[in-house]
Amino acid sequence: MKQQLKIAELLKRIETSKQQDIELGTYEIYLFSQNELEKGQIGYRYDKHQNSLISEENGKWKEEWIVIGYETDMGDPVFVNIDDDAYPVYTAERGTELWQPVHIGNIDEIIKQL
């Protein structure tokens, strides 16, 4: 998984602030630390055996989505689209056949809270 500058900035802020729980709109979110980020991709970018789950098919996990944490109430993934210069942040319901992202903010809003 390639490391993006904004993701690196987020991880650095988490490390220095020691804060991993934030609120973004109505969502309470746990953010992954540097040590948790790679493991946090399991079940989304790839399975536990490192087999890719990425596909360009509609409703499948996209290459440009990086999981940065999870919504603490339901455990749904919180992820950023690294191909968009605004670095929008989404969540989507786990356990469904298709991923249907819901926009909840952007990465700069998260960084400002740390």
Give the location of each predicted region:
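A surface-exposed partner-binding patch
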Residues: M1-F79
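Generic hydrophobic, helix-prone segments enriched in Leu/Val/Ile
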Residues: E9-I14, V89, I111-L114
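Short conserved micro-motifs at the rims of enzyme active sites and ligand-binding pockets
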Residues: V78-N81, P101-H103
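Compact, glycine/acidic-enriched structural inserts
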Residues: A92-L114
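Intrinsically disordered, low-complexity regulatory segments enriched in Ser/Thr/Pro
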Residues: V80, D85-E97
